[in-house]
Amino acid sequence: MPLPPDLHVHTEWSWDAPSGDMEHSCERALEIGLPGIAFTEHADWVTIHDGQHVLDIAGFHQAIERCRAKFKNLQILSGVELGEPHWYPEPTRAVLAAGPLDRVLGSIHCVRIADDVVDASQFRLRPADEQPGAIHEYFRETLAMVESDEPFDTLAHLDYPKRYWPEDMQPYREGDYEEEIRAILLAAAHRGLVLEANSTRGEEGKLCPGLTVLRWWREVGGEAVSFGSDAHRPDKVAGGFGLATQVVQAAGFKPSADPMSLWRR
């Protein structure tokens, strides 16, 4: 089965991708036979990490056009990954107004815990009695974003905290959060969003979301799934896609004749 386009890739234009390279990512996409690639750079306004900076959206658009001119046999899409866009509506809309974008991802990375803003990758560093509540807060914040009127088309890495689940805790089980996850999926389906299958960790246990949630997505009426490696360097483009396509197909979604199309029910 041919690989689908990778619709979630970061390059040197994202603050957390020092090894990213747009041109080399295009070369990698052609090398492995992808029909297309979407560069979805971080547009984040929570500043809790060292080296964080605002996306140079004008420079990004210029780089996209250079790559389109150079790699004519690859469909290159422009995009952004909006972090907590419902917290920052004005800068979000400014980024979206700066030029045409083919893909706009909505993501939750951070939540508010007491007086702190905490990235979900750092939940494991919080006191043990805070961690279960932090996961529930993550899903509450995701629902708030989906129910907001912020303009994005794809819900990215729905159960992002699973990537960083502490090995000394009980295994992550979707069923423990089923009510919250289904509420998010239902709201996303009503809004007509695409659900991303994020393969950044490769193995099925860390596919975000996994088979169980992808099946729930179909049950609540979700229409489409996209594939995103969340690559932050060229050699990771489409990483885990072989397995991800099998899982998405097992959940009841299938490709169309157009290799650039989303997978649908």
Residue ranges of predicted features:
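Short, basic, glycine/proline-bearing loop/turn elements
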Residues: 8-12, 76-80, 126-130, 196-201
